[in-house]
Amino acid sequence: MQWADVVNDPTLRNLPYKIELNQYGQIVMTPHWPIHSEIQSLLQDALNDRLAGGRAVQEYAIQTTAGVRVADVVWRSEERWSEIRAAGAVPAPVAPEICIEVQSSSNTEAEMAEKRALYFEAGALEVWLYDESGRLRFFDPDGERAQSKLVPSFPLRVDI
């Protein structure tokens, strides 16, 4: 199955799940809690308030070497958006500069490490992890950082 098949399948619309494709073209569905969406909105708003020259967006489908992954929140520059639009592809053939995952208790550290690696391989400059305590962890391709290089004013905690 290809991402275009998923997007165009009417039976997969309006499901209470985040849908991704693994490297074998199989659908992977993850349940979404309302608080997850609230956190995504807070992060999106905070990014848009602090970073000019682009836009924060939720639920961003990114083509990776292990299938399609959907980042919870991303920030992409206008230049990156032009590159994504010019490719005319669904999903995005290159990752936005910042990819954020909102972790839940069902996410393992190994799963998050894999997603970070996939986003970096696809072109992300930073990957952020938001944990259930409200703490943010910032990563660049070299490892974990004390704060974001791209948005140094971003808080280390975002409470709901």
Regions of interest found by a model, annotated:
Residues 1-160:
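Gly/Pro/Ser/Thr-rich low-complexity, intrinsically disordered segments predominantly at protein N-termini
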